[in-house]
Amino acid sequence: MSYSTLICGSGGAGRHVAEVLTKDGRGRITGLFDPVPAQLEKSQQAHPDATAGDDYERLLDQVDPDVVVVAGPDHLHADQSIMALEHGCHVLIEKPLATTSEDAQRIVDAQERTGLQVMTDHTVRYIYPWREMALAAQAEDIGRIFFIQGEYIHDLWSHYSPESPHYTPWRIDRDNPQNILLGGGCHPIDIMLWTIDSPVTEVFSYSSGFSVPGFPSDDCYIVVMRFENEAIGKVFVTSGCSGNQWTESGCGFLAVHGTDGTLYKGELSRRHEESVTLEDSSA
């Protein structure tokens, strides 16, 4: 079956999902929404047969899609997702699900009310080597986990700077700036929680906000956690780091230490043994 899909937010994330859907064959792009003409034009070039426009509710009525991909500014995810559910559409939401616990609950309530499917697009679960590291830890290849660490180290200056071709104004909007702990830190947090599969019982955090001049929110976070199974964890998130090696979409993501070994950078290491590179299960 091929699902009719409307892309709500035609920036990089939305275009990537549209590309994957099209290549996979189980989705066809029938609608494109974005209030920014340049973004809409880029998507139209790839999907010329799709109905495009800057009125989201009107497009929902016109296109009547099976699925809506919500990939616009983070603070709009809740309203746009709920509107799609109320129009009878399943929803795939670019991470984060929402930017407040109240908005997250509103989405959950709308899903339960409509009975439709809602999923957050946590891509790291499907990417080598982090998926393979998580599966190896779940299989107890390193024994009992006592410490788990995740990182999102991403120089986002090109997205914050008006002089950059990658400038994304909503990220530095003074009223609704992107919370990088939610918008980027959700990658390591999600893969950590999936890997360890134990509830968090305690959490503590520090943050600062001076590494990105003019950014209207904190840009560096350290989060420390204790899990129900007595393991401890740490998350480091920064969007103000400086250097060419940090310009990819987040670095680090995961390290897992167990009583019988360690998983780090796609390798399984045990005392007195040569490290083994994990096999890519998607290859």
What are these regions (language model features)?
Residues 27, 281-283:
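C-terminal helical cap and adjacent loop that interface with cofactors, partners, or active-site loops
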Residues 105-124, 143-147:
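Rossmann-fold dehydrogenase core element
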Residues 124-215:
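Predominantly a Rossmann-like dinucleotide-binding segment in NAD(P)-dependent oxidoreductases
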Residues 1-47:
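N-terminal Rossmann-like dinucleotide-binding module
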Residues 183, 189-272:
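Contiguous beta-strand/loop segments that form the cofactor/metal-binding neighborhood of enzyme cores
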Residues 70, 93-94, 99, 118-120, ...:
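Hydrophobic residues in well-ordered beta-strands that form the structural core
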Residues 11, 17, 50-110:
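Beta-loop-alpha module in the N-terminal Rossmann-like domain of NAD(P)-dependent dehydrogenases
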